[in-house]
Amino acid sequence: IQAAGLVLEGNKVSVNAVNKLYKREIFESLRFPVGKLSEDAFIMVKLLAGVGRAVLDTRPKYYYVHREDSITTSKYKPKDLNVIEAYTGNREFVLKNCPQLNTQADFRYFWAHFYVLDKMLSTPGFKKDGDFKRIVRTLRSNYFNILRNPITGRKRKIALTGLMLGSWLYKLIISGHFKSKRRLVG
């Protein structure tokens, strides 16, 4: 269960199935969903919550290259909503089976909404549709829950506060428009 929590936090362990070793028996009852983006996210929490022992080694042994125009770096498409679907399922699973991970599951659930919203707003010509409005509504209605979550970073909390005023301000904040500029004195 602790390993599942680390995956949900996303600092030391990624949700990706690559760079991990598994016993064959684990996959007798679990299958990756077909036709979904972020298919790893659909099963990794259930998988790790169900194992008796997990070993973590943070030494780099696998080097992942982010290609421009890969699935994770491409412009927004409706299939990106699969990320929210995956972490909604994880959140429900955690609530029923390992409530001690609620903080981590909430963090990742909201992270998924931010991830998709960021992709939407960074896609030129994106039209604010029903999915956009639903994501913004979810984040706004959980404003205080997100602010109280100790895993959510300061910059994300500031961006969320901007979203409360308008998506235009949120977009300015996440695009780095307000980066601090240091002046040299002397």
Q: Which residues does each PLM region occupy?
A:
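Donor-binding/catalytic cores of nucleotide-activated saccharide
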Residues: 1-55, 65-78
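Short alpha-helical segments used as structural interaction elements across diverse proteins
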Residues: 17, 105, 153-154
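Catalytic-loop motifs flanking and including active-site residues across diverse enzymes
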Residues: 43, 86, 109
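A structural signal for short, well-ordered beta-strand segments and their strand-loop junctions
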Residues: 55-57, 104
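Catalytic core of nucleotide-sugar-dependent glycosyltransferases
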Residues: 60-68, 74-101, 113-145
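All-alpha amphipathic helical-bundle segments outside canonical DNA-binding/catalytic cores
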Residues: 101-108
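Membrane-interface aromatic/basic loop that binds lipid-linked glycans or pyrophosphate carriers
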Residues: 124-186
